[in-house]
Every structure is written in structure tokens, then in C-alpha cells.
A protein has these predicted regions:
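Hydrophobic core of transmembrane alpha-helices in multi-pass small-molecule transporters
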Residues: 119-138, 419, 427-442
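C-terminal ends and interior cores of transmembrane alpha-helices
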Residues: 97-116, 394-411
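Cytoplasmic membrane-interface "Motif A"-like loop-to-helix N-cap segments
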Residues: 84-96, 374-390
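Single conserved hydrophobic/aromatic residue that forms the stacking wall/gate
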Residues: 1-8, 13, 468, 473-478
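Central cavity-lining transmembrane alpha-helices of secondary-active solute carriers
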Residues: 65-80, 359-367
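Pair of pore-lining "gating" transmembrane helices in MFS-fold secondary transporters
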Residues: 20-43, 310-323, 437
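Intracellular loop-helix junctions on the cytosolic face of multi-pass helical membrane proteins
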Residues: 9-10, 14-22, 152-160, 181-349, ...
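Glycine-rich segments within core transmembrane alpha-helices of 12-TM secondary carriers
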Residues: 164-178, 470, 474
Length: 478
């Protein structure tokens, strides 16, 4: 199964999956559609909260963090529901429908600037909670079904590479999601006669609130003239209202793309669900009871040992999760405030850097698989805990690079007083690109192999909920 070739036709894709269970490809495609929708939202979430509601970075970050916390907690709940009912497929379908409803709540355009902040911010948070709950019903349980495919001895040795393929498909969707979000937002701005500028939403809110310094006011006027197709605006308050409305509405329409992605994922899953394992049918064909034969054979002592092993692994990799989840928060803030948004004549948006990680995952996965395959052939493949330890060390290197590259940049308070940095004062975009490259290498040592490890170690009766404890930030955050 190694190495993988990333270009090609339907036959090329089939060749990669030839030695794997036939349900792996539809599961990966359904997951890719759902992840595409999720990453469309995550690429713009914090920037949407700031531009729509005028939140500062701290409060936008709190909502972002609580949302992620909800994803993990509700994922555990979703896993418990599926493990209790053994109806994994029904739980997955329900999750897709609930997620679509959540995206609908945040996709409906509402007045901007927001005059009734408590009402509309509450509606947005309810939408995010709904997405998190639907995500909890969907993600871990789909992974559990994939893991059950490899419980068959015929495919057991292919488990790690199978989950790596599954993981790579997640990232195919994640590559294009930020691009689509940017394209929809910028298209809507253009229909209103505006160009994109990352600093203007914050300046508009500052102007309307009377909070701009003289330097920031001067920059606000200059940028307003630069982005307006009809020349420099005379009424700056009207410009601020119009620009904020166009900017936020473009984000609302980008969230609408996520709804379409959920529906596509739903169709793929429904069309192929017969090829996926069904634990309830296995029970009926076996003992006729609600308890799997595998569960009967596993003693309580072994269950405890497996759970403690998983807890030990998670207690270590939680520090990797801390670093990884900065991609939608502090690294996005850094892209917006400190990074030069151009490479030569190519203009960039702050959100585009979130495509770097999945891009590198897709193109580095074959190399990592080939490396592990070569080591396995020589009998020298590192154990899963060793791979995780290596990955965490590589992740630390990524942030050392980031730290060294950002030495000397002005503090945030100074940037705010100035109304943003000029292009000449910003750092090269290759700093973030390089950081994402190194962080992705670390991720590939941890994430797909972590899902595989948990699918093997989790007691059968707890697979749905425990697969969400796997060392896999992208697949959960997601």
C-alpha cells in the first residue's frame, strides 16, 4: 500500500484502497465532506466574531476555546450514546443533520454593525453548540466503524495505513475549505464595491466606538480610500457601517457552504452505509443478545488496564493539542496582524495559512507512510508511543522557529495604537508556512497513528466514546 501517488484518476484511488475493506473509501469520502464544511467555518470563526460583533482577541478566543471544549465533551457523550445503543450508523446520520442545523443558524445574515449584541451573539453561540453536539454524534462513531472494519483478521495488519488514508482524506477537504471561505467573503465584498483588508473591520469598530488614536484614524482614512472602488469616502461613519456589513455578510454566506458540504456527506453516507459494519446485526447473528461476544470475553481487569493505558497516552499528547489548536487562534491573529499578506504579486488573506497544514498533510502522508513501511520491513519501526514522543519533539521545534522569527515585532498594544502595521513592518509569510510545515510533520507522527492505536486498545463496549480520546487534534477539531 506504500507509497501513495497523489495525482490521478479514479483507478489510482481504487488501487490505494485495493487491500483495504470496501467500506473505507465511502467512509473517508463522507468524512471528507463533513470536514470540508467544518474547516470552512473554522478558517474564519475568530475573525468572524471580531468583525461581526466587534469582539477583541481575548473574548473571541474565549468563545473559540469554549467551542473546542464543547466538541471534546459532547464527542464523549455522542460516543456513549452510540456505544449504549450500538446504533452507530443512526447516530452518525443524526449528527450530520444536527450539524447542518447549526451551520444554518450562523449562516443566516443578520444586521451588521450589531445593535443588539446579547441577542445575536447568543444565537451564534447556540449555533456553535449545535454544531459541536452534531460533531460529537458523528466523528468518533464514524472512526469506530472504520476501526471495526480492521477487527477482521484479513485486514488487521493494514490498520495503521488504513487510518492514515482515512486521515489524508480529511485533509483533502481541509485544504480547500479556507480558500472557499475567502473566495465567498471577497466575492461579496466586491459586489458592494470593496476590496479585502484585514485591518479594516477592527478600525471600523474603533471608529464607530470613538476609540481610534490619531495614528489609527489616519490609517483608517487611507485604507478606506484604498479599498473603495468609488474613491475615497466622504462620510466615514457610513463607510464603516457598509464595510462591516459587507465583510460579515460574506462570512455568513461562507458558512452556508458548510451546509452544502453536510448534505453531500449525508448523501455519500446513505448511499454506501450497507458497506459499513453494523454491530447490531453482528449481535443478532451471534448471541442474539445486546452484548457483543468480544465484550463478554474481555475481563473487567483488562478493560481497566486498557483505559488506563489510553489515559496515560492522552495525558502526554494533550500538550501537543495545546500547540496544534493555535492554528485557528494565535497563529491566525499573527497572520492578520504581523504577517506580510503577499508573495511577490500574489495577494494573500489571513485565513489562507490554515490551508498550509492540510496541504502538507496530504503531500507528506505518502512520505511518512513510506518511511514507516521501510522501517517496518527492516524490523525497526518505532512503537506508537515512540512515534508520539518523536512527534512532540518536532512540534516543539516548530514553535522555536516561530519564536525566533517573531523576535523584534511590536507588541500588540503598539500595533493597535498604530491601527495596524504597514507591509514593510510585517514578517515574511514563509515564517508561518515553515512553522506549519514542521508542525505537520509532528502531527503525522501522532494523529493518524493515534486513532489506530485507540481503535485497537479501546474496549469494544467503549469504542465510540474512547475514540474521541485519541491523540488526533485534527480529527476531533475537526
Amino acid at each position: 500500500e506504500i507509497p501513495l501517488r497523489l495525482v490521478g484518476s479514479e483507478m489510482c484511488i481504487r488501487d490505494r484502497f485495493k487491500n483495504h475493506p470496501k467500506g473505507l473509501l465511502p467512509a473517508a469520502l463522507a468524512n471528507m465532506g463533513e470536514r470540508f464544511g467544518f474547516y470552512t467555518m473554522m478558517a474564519i470563526l475568530t475573525l468572524f466574531l471580531m468583525s461581526k460583533f466587534g469582539l477583541d482577541k481575548t473574548n473571541a478566543g474565549i468563545i473559540y476555546s469554549v467551542f473546542y471544549f464543547s466538541i471534546y465533551i459532547l464527542a464523549f457523550v455522542g460516543g456513549l450514546i452510540a456505544d449504549k445503543t450500538r446504533n452507530y450508523k443512526g447516530t452518525i446520520l443524526t449528527g450530520l443533520v444536527i450539524m447542518a442545523a447549526g451551520y444554518l443558524l450562523i449562516a443566516i445574515p443578520t444586521p451588521t454593525p450589531v445593535r443588539n449584541l446579547p441577542l445575536y451573539l447568543t444565537v451564534t453561540c447556540i449555533g456553535l453548540f449545535t454544531i459541536a453536539f452534531g460533531n460529537g454524534l458523528f466523528k468518533g462513531n464514524l472512526q469506530a466503524l472504520v476501526g471495526q472494519m480492521y477487527d477482521n483478521e484479513k485486514y488487521g495488519k493494514m490498520r495503521d495505513s488504513g487510518f492514515s488514508l482515512f486521515y489524508m482524506f480529511i485533509n483533502v477537504g481541509a485544504i480547500f475549505a479556507p480558500m472557499v471561505a475567502i473566495g465567498v467573503r471577497n466575492w461579496w465584498l466586491s459586489t458592494k464595491g470593496f476590496l479585502y483588508n484585514p485591518d479594516l473591520p477592527e478600525l471600523c469598530h474603533g471608529f464607530l466606538g470613538g476609540n481610534l488614536s490619531p495614528e489609527a484614524s489616519e490609517r483608517f482614512a487611507a485604507l478606506a480610500a484604498e479599498v473603495s472602488s468609488n474613491g475615497a469616502p466622504i462620510d466615514m461613519a457610513a463607510f464603516a457601517d457598509s464595510y462591516l456589513s459587507a465583510f460579515a455578510t460574506g462570512f455568513h454566506y461562507a458558512f452556508g457552504v458548510a451546509i452544502a458540504a453536510m448534505l453531500i456527506s449525508l448523501v455519500i453516507f446513505l448511499a454506501n452505509k450497507k458497506s459499513l459494519p453494523d454491530p447490531r446485526q453482528a449481535q443478532a447473528a451471534g448471541t442474539g443478545s445486546r452484548i457483543d461476544p468480544g465484550e463478554v470475553r474481555m475481563a473487567a481487569k483488562e478493560v481497566r488496564q486498557r483505559i488506563w493505558a489510553l489515559i496515560a497516552v492522552c495525558a502526554v499528547v494533550i500538550f501537543f493539542w495545546f500547540s496544534f489548536h493555535q492554528n485557528g487562534l494565535t497563529l491566525t491573529y499573527f497572520a492578520k496582524d504581523y504577517t506580510r499578506l503577499s508573495i511577490g504579486s500574489l495577494g494573500l488573506s489571513a485565513e489562507i495559512f490554515q490551508s498550509m497544514n492540510p496541504f502538507f498533510v496530504v503531500f507528506l502522508t505518502p512520505l511518512v507512510l513510506a518511511f514507516f513501511g521501510m522501517m517496518r520491513a527492516r524490523g525497526k519501526e518505532p512503537s506508537t508511543p515512540a512515534k508520539i514522543a518523536i512527534g512532540m519533539g518536532i512540534a516543539a521545534v516548530a514553535y522555536v522557529v516561530m519564536m525566533l522569527g517573531s523576535l523584534g515585532v511590536p507588541p500588540a498594544a503598539e500595533v493597535e495604537r498604530m491601527g495596524g502595521l504597514s507591509e514593510a513592518q510585517r514578517v515574511t509569510p514563509f515564517l508561518l508556512i515553515g512553522t506549519y510545515l514542521i508542525l505537520t510533520i509532528a502531527e503525522l507522527f501522532i494523529s493518524p497513528l493515534g486513532i489506530s492505536f485507540v481503535s485497537k486498545a479501546a474496549p469494544p463496549q467503549y469504542q465510540g466514546c474512547l475514540l474521541y480520546t485519541s491523540p488526533s487534534p485534527r480529527d476531533v477539531e475537526e
